[in-house]
Amino acid sequence: MVYTITCNPSLDYGVTVENFQMGHTNRTVTEQMNVGGKGINVSIVLKHLGIPTKILGFTAGFTGREIEKRIKEQEIEAEWIRLPQGDSRINVKLLSNEGTEINGQGPDISKKEVQELEEKLGILTKE
């Protein structure tokens, strides 16, 4: 089992816009919503390679619930620490002549919540 840690998971909203013009209304040609975050991305690749994996990380708010749902739909094992405030981030990926990314900040994580993750990791090292 390979464990990955994602402290700041995201919903990545990718849109394709032909001839994007700053300061004007632009219409999308395609839209796509995916889960993201470095640990999540690694676990997705491991799953596709047939390697058992489990995600450990933090989620918050409605976006966090959507991240959890989408990971479950991909049949990837995960253990989330739900943060009481804020929302997991949304990243906007604008594809046009040039690619532009706008990454959300994500929720604040308290020392108590970091300790909770450290305890989970401590249990793993004893196994």
Task: Describe these PLM feature segments.
Residues 1-56, 65-66:
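Glycine-rich phosphate/adenosyl-contacting loop at the front of the ribokinase-like
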Residues 49-127:
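Conserved N-terminal subdomain of the carbohydrate kinase-like
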